From Swiss-Prot:
Pfam families: Enc34_ssDNA-bd (PF10991). This is Putative protein p50. SUPFAM superfamilies: Nucleic acid-binding proteins. Disulfide bonds: none annotated. InterPro entries: Enc34_ssDNA-bd, NA-bd_OB-fold.
Length: 184
């Protein structure tokens, strides 16, 4: 079942080059989408989509039982509580984790294609995204989200790992170098 996530914050995007998790497993494109807990309409739509997939995969009689058995297992469920993570921007949000072995569509606001060189989308910006939920049986039941596409929506405060230095952080040593050469 496909769901469109409108105006959600992007975290840990790997949209242009596939990666492995901790150097293991299949190479995939991936991203997390942060959803404020106050956006109950979107959260309920996501949960309904997940329950729909559970019903299709395992039958309608045990939907709530299966949902409840996997919803608190981060290895078996794509929608998670951001309060359990110590990452920038996660507190007060749920996050939906999605991945795909195939490269997702990545477009700008005007639907033109984006590349890594464009610098958008980036971790911390706001995007629209489409995902598709699917159920699986692999040493137990689970529901994951396949990443289909991401559209840059608007700028946001970038999540960074410390950032890059600016020129203002350094002294101009050009005169000092000349003085050292003259003194020797």
């Amino acid at each position: 079942m496909k769901i469109k996530l409108n105006n959600v914050r992007l975290a840990f995007p790997e949209l242009f080059e596939p990666t492995q998790v901790s150097g293991q497993g299949a190479f995939k494109y991936r991203a997390n989408f942060l959803i404020p807990k106050s956006r109950t309409d979107l959260i309920e739509e996501i949960k309904a989509g997940i329950k729909h997939v559970i019903g299709e995969k395992w039958g309608n009689k045990d939907i709530e039982k299966i949902y409840n058995s996997i919803c608190n297992n981060p290895n078996r469920f794509c929608l998670r509580d951001g309060d359990s993570k110590e990452y920038d921007g996660y507190a007060g949000n749920l996050y939906l984790s999605a991945s795909n072995k195939s490269r997702p569509l990545v477009i700008d606001r005007n639907t033109s294609p984006l590349t890594a060189q464009d610098g958008r989308p980036y971790s911390g910006c706001y995007v629209n995204a489409t995902v598709e939920f699917y159920g699986y049986d692999n040493n137990g039941k689970g529901v994951s989200a396949s990443l289909r596409g991401v559209q840059f929506f608007r700028d946001g405060d970038a999540f960074t790992g410390g950032g890059v230095a600016s020129v203002e952080e350094f002294d101009d040593l050009s005169m000092a170098e000349e003085e050292e050469l003259l003194a020797s």
